């Protein structure tokens, strides 16, 4: 009898009357393979002689981010709607014990050397935005989304609403010290950003470019940005 299997010898015996020997053998082999198969999450790199088992996350939905010598783990809650964020340090293939950074997180990203994430707020569809370096720091509230830009600043999307023009929101920029308004009522479907700045169309058709802390209205009546 296989203690970790639902297949019993009596099941195989009863199949012999209606199935071929080959079919019964295949069922038995599959049951044995299922019992001895390695399951769960493993970490390995060029220093490891054997993969490191990450048993703490077994049986849960988890996603992993590797950044430098850090291993970040998003361990999802039962609803799969939010997750807890853990951080490990990896040294010569040895994975440190988990350090919990926060819970009830909706989304996260590594920007520079910091972890940025949106944390759900009870009773609200929006989130608080945090940055975690050596400790947790709240950057802003009522945040719908965010993105890191090539110059190290962070684009923050707030006051998100749906309209006849599509999804529109107010755009803010965090420069490492403060958050400043870029523009109100920007159409998110047409927004593009690069190392040159941010281009977008405001509700009503104004084509705008934000670059070097200045907002320029390029044209009116625009409905699509092909490239930027």
Language model: regions and residue ranges:
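Short loop/turn segments that connect beta-strands within beta-propeller blades
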Residues: 46-48, 89-93, 132-135, 174-177, ...
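A short beta-strand motif characteristic of beta-propeller blades
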Residues: 49-55, 96-101, 135-140, 178-183, ...
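Short beta-strand elements that form the blades of beta-propeller/WD-repeat-like
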Residues: 1, 23-37, 41, 69-75, ...
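Structural motif
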Residues: 38-43, 79-88, 123-130, 163-172, ...
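Fold-core signature of tandem repeat domains
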Residues: 66, 71, 85, 110, ...
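N-terminal "mature head" segments of proteins
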Residues: 1-59
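Repeated scaffold domains used in trafficking and secretory/extracellular systems
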Residues: 20-27, 59-67, 103-112, 142-151, ...
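Hydrophilic extracytoplasmic domains
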Residues: 205-228
